[in-house]
């Protein structure tokens, strides 16, 4: 069984046992979160507005890979280099 869930305006197709990286959530490591699915997909049918919740467990909080932003103005000797690392949360899907 699969489910389509929405977390922080992003959609994920998940099934039990999946581990995924989502935008940082205000939860402690080890907490179990309940998320309402948008679509439930069985082998034979698809249910819109399904009943029940998807339970995910917070495994860790971490930062994503660095993205470098480089600005330059030609002939003016202006250069600016900034880096950014997005904060993320790693979760595991427990049950549906």
Curated annotation (Swiss-Prot):
One of its GO terms (biological process) is translation. One of its GO terms (molecular function) is structural constituent of ribosome. It holds the Pfam family Ribosomal_L21p. InterPro entries: bL21-like, bL21-like_sf, Ribosomal_bL21, Ribosomal_bL21_CS. PANTHER family: 50S RIBOSOMAL PROTEIN L21, LARGE RIBOSOMAL SUBUNIT PROTEIN BL21M. This protein binds to 23S rRNA in the presence of protein L20. Belongs to the bacterial ribosomal protein bL21 family. This is Large ribosomal subunit protein bL21. It comes from Prosthecochloris aestuarii (strain DSM 271 / SK 413). The gene is rplU.
């Amino acid at each position: 069984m699969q489910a389509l869930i929405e977390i922080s305006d992003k959609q994920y197709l998940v099934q039990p046992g999946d581990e995924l990286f989502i935008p940082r959530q205000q939860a402690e490591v080890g907490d179990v979160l309940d998320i309402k699915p948008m679509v439930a997909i069985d082998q034979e049918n698809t249910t819109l507005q399904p009943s029940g919740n998807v339970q995910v467990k917070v495994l860790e909080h971490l930062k994503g890979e660095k993205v470098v932003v480089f600005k330059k103005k030609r002939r003016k000797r202006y250069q600016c280099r900034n880096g950014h690392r997005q904060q993320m949360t790693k979760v595991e899907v427990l049950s549906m």
